Amino acid sequence: MGRLLALSLLGIALALLGERLLALRNRLKASREVESVDLPNCHLIKGIEAGAEDIDILPNGLAFFSVGLKCPGLHSFAPDKPGGILMMDLNEENPRALELRVSRGFNLASFNPHGISTFIDSDDTVYLFVVNHPEFKNTVEIFKFEEEENSLLHLKTIKHELLPSVNDIIAVGPEHFYATNDHYFSDPFLKYLETYLNLHWTNVVYYSPNEVKVVAEGFDSANGINISPDKKYIYVADILAHEIHVLEKHPNMNLTQLKVLKLDTLVDNLSIDPSSGDVLVGCHPNGQKLFVYDPKNPPSSEVLRIQNILSEKPTVTTVYANNGSVLQGSSVASVYDKKLLIGTLYHRALYCEL
């Protein structure tokens, strides 16, 4: 009787594991292939060889790149090189990516930047917020951008128990931001288990010097985040659920879900086209290729444009798609004055003139 019970429990456990594995493959879109959608007048950006996970562009055309991200279990083309912040002036005829100097006292050796966001104060001071993973921990760094010196002055490091696994950030004040946690746990093994079991425990946190709180939760894996041009709505990408959530922002900074847009791809970072309000999305057509790297069958890239996201039927178009022969693992796309920048999780970055 005991053996029969043990065998029954083992069978149930194996069936559950098999079901979870199949569900994970579906969430990763493990069988999906992408058809190429090419853009003319594109070239790879010199100096970006190991990823530009996030990009943010100021209204004056200065673009910031978060480069060199490293995560446990994730492929890296430069595993021993610290990350950094690069800048490109898109007003130049042939813009180049230049690394910004960082003020003394900041630990550059462990700099591991992830999501980034800029905020321009009423006195025109530019702040750069950077999600950082020094030694695979979680902090948010606030810098002041000093344009004349092409440098960043480090102002503050933020750590908080409600920020255990920060992915992306959108600044809404000089020390105020919304941030996504892509996992509930910070321990790598528990992160893998959480993803495998599909617990939907990830969230969005609002941070200010006076208040820190969870303002949205229940995501499979909350990832990219941005804000509408009128500052009334927050957009959140749920990468493994293939969704973009539109949330209304209230005066107390709480969020209320307004709608969910379902897509057929893994949605990463979100950018806003300042000329139209369209949402540009860096996507991973096949997540399994992204996380299990094979140079003979590399991860593909995909960029979507979403028009009228607040309407009942938003228009979704594919701006760019590549099977990995040019660009592997696109994570972000940002546009300025008919110039498109596409960054990747750990590969190169692309500059296109539209």
UniProtKB/Swiss-Prot annotation:
Glycans are attached at N254, N269, N323. Its EC number is 3.1.1.2, 3.1.1.81. Disulfide bonds join C42-C352. It comes from the Eukaryota. Keywords: Calcium, Disulfide bond, Glycoprotein, Hydrolase, Membrane, Metal-binding, Signal. Gene3D superfamilies: TolB, C-terminal domain. GO terms for biological process: response to toxic substance. Ca(2+) 1 binds at E53, N167, N223, D268, N269. Binds 2 calcium ions per subunit. Its cofactor is Ca(2+). Ca(2+) 2 binds at D54, I116, D168. It is an enzyme of class 3 (hydrolase). InterPro entries: 6-blade_b-propeller_TolB-like, Arylesterase, Paraoxonase2, Serum_paraoxonase/arylesterase. The active site is at H114 (proton acceptor). It is a peripheral membrane protein. One of its GO terms (molecular function) is metal ion binding. Pfam families: Arylesterase (PF01731). Glycosylated. The signal sequence is not cleaved. The keyword Disulfide bond applies. It catalyses: a phenyl acetate + H2O = a phenol + acetate + H(+); an N-acyl-L-homoserine lactone + H2O = an N-acyl-L-homoserine + H(+). It is found in: Membrane. GO terms for cellular component: extracellular region; membrane. Belongs to the paraoxonase family. Homotrimer. Capable of hydrolyzing lactones and a number of aromatic carboxylic acid esters. This is Serum paraoxonase/arylesterase 2. It comes from Bos taurus (Bovine). The lineage of its organism: Eukaryota, Metazoa, Chordata, Craniata, Vertebrata. The gene is PON2.
